[in-house]
Amino acid sequence: MARLFGTDGVRGVANADLTAELALALASAAVEEVADRGTPPPGPVDGVPVARSAHGIDHRPLVVVGRDTRPSGEFLEAAVVAGLARAGADVTRIGVVPTPAVSYVVAATGADLGVMLSASHNPMPDNGIKLFAAGGLKLPDDVEDAIERRMAGPAARRPVAAAVGRVRDDSMLVDGYVDHLLATLPGGPGGLRGLRVVVDCAQGAASDLAPRVLRAAGADVIALHADGDGLRINDRSGATHLDSLRDAVVAHGADAGIAHDGDADRCLAVDSAGEIVDGDQILALCALALAERGELERGTVVVTVMSNLGFHHAMRDAGIDVVTTPVGDRYVLEAMRSGAYSLGGEQSGHVVFLRHAGTGDGLLTALQILGRMAETSQPLHELAKAMTRLPQVLVNVRGVDRARAETSDELRAAVADAEAELAGAGRVLLRPSGTEPLVRVMVEAPTDELARDVAGRLADVVQRALR
């Protein structure tokens, strides 16, 4: 049986793969596993006080639940809440919020578990369930595996009478998240006065909060795709479709553009000329800023195997060490925690500032980018020169057996030939997706033409060898 949890929770087409029955069963199993473990939380995110003990023999588990704007989120939330309450957990619903808001509220309230209903950047028919442990960190793999075993085992004895969980709504808890974000801004609240910013909310979870936070920080804000229309979430908008943001930044004469995905755990940017500033460039400029302030713990940044070689060269030249992990912000976070590092992230725009958040936070990242612009009086295109990108081509090969990607002799030989052709001046990476049925072919080379040529040939081999 395939593992239920992927690299970022459970995902699938809502009401087909991800059903109400599955959501209910998963929620109950998660509460039972967390309650039985009774493990103390790793502590709150720095600066986030724990307001409630999460432990004790007679303790009733507390769970925080949020969702994005997808229509399917409504019935899935109902199923999740039912599963939590029938297992004896008290539930606090905080409404439509970014994923990192759930992480923050879990830490701030001392909750035992957090549940976010979102499929992030995936299209509208999909949805997902992300789980956060006490302290606001994502559940480790071994806990997810234990939850799956519970789901496959005999039903647990259910509480009755006064022992069943209670449910309440408290969207006001999100105000604390907003205050927390503003407190991280270099220069303090109001520090973005004089900056005009276009923010693309992808019709997702940030549709209300992103413009609100930026305005509270003093920016002149033009909100794009911010109606909260879940039927159009991520539809030609947000962090995976930057064309409309690029056009809007130029049309409005804005200093910068900010793009979030459906659950706002990622952030990409656009400079005043409409040029894209990706996650690697954001990490580079933030690393230099933190190093300058003496806040880059152990002089190290954590990235994934997808980060551009140009990033590694820039950090080397700046005297900053780089730790590399598999793809997935959970693995970045694990490396950051184990090494006591303060900054890490992915090229896709997941950036983790561990002094302020327990997960990637798009709104927090936007404030750090814009705050650096205000702090230095430099335009974004100048700050983005913190690194020079090597041409990189990414090809998604669909309709193949991704499970065989690491065992195919034909594919292994093709990769070896490509690496020999690049002769150390570039690199090749083949990676089965952890969230979608495809294999990604990534090639970096001294020229765009060579990168495209090598990537195209490798993609053909993947299609032939793995079909």
UniProtKB/Swiss-Prot annotation:
The gene coding this protein: glmM
Query: Which InterPro entries does the protein's record reference?
Result: A-D-PHexomutase_a/b/a-I, A-D-PHexomutase_a/b/a-I/II/III, A-D-PHexomutase_a/b/a-II, A-D-PHexomutase_a/b/a-III, A-D-PHexomutase_C, A-D-PHexomutase_C_sf, A-D-PHexomutase_CS, Alpha-D-phosphohexomutase_SF
Protein's UniProt name: Phosphoglucosamine mutase
Gene3D superfamilies registered for this protein in UniProt: Alpha-D-Glucose-1,6-Bisphosphate, subunit A, domain 3, Alpha-D-phosphohexomutase, C-terminal domain
Q: Which domain of life is it from?
A: Bacteria
Residues that, per the record, bind Mg(2+) = S120, D261, D263, D265
This protein's record includes keyword Transcription: no
**Residues modified to Phosphoserine:** S120
Functional summary from the UniProt entry: Catalyzes the conversion of glucosamine-6-phosphate to glucosamine-1-phosphate.
Task: Please name the top-level EC class of this enzyme.
Answer: isomerase
Q: Which Gene Ontology terms of cellular component type are present?
A: cytosol
Give the GO biological process terms.
Answer: carbohydrate metabolic process; peptidoglycan biosynthetic process; UDP-N-acetylglucosamine biosynthetic process
Query: Which taxonomic lineage does the organism of this UniProt entry have?
Result: Bacteria, Bacillati, Actinomycetota, Actinomycetes, Frankiales
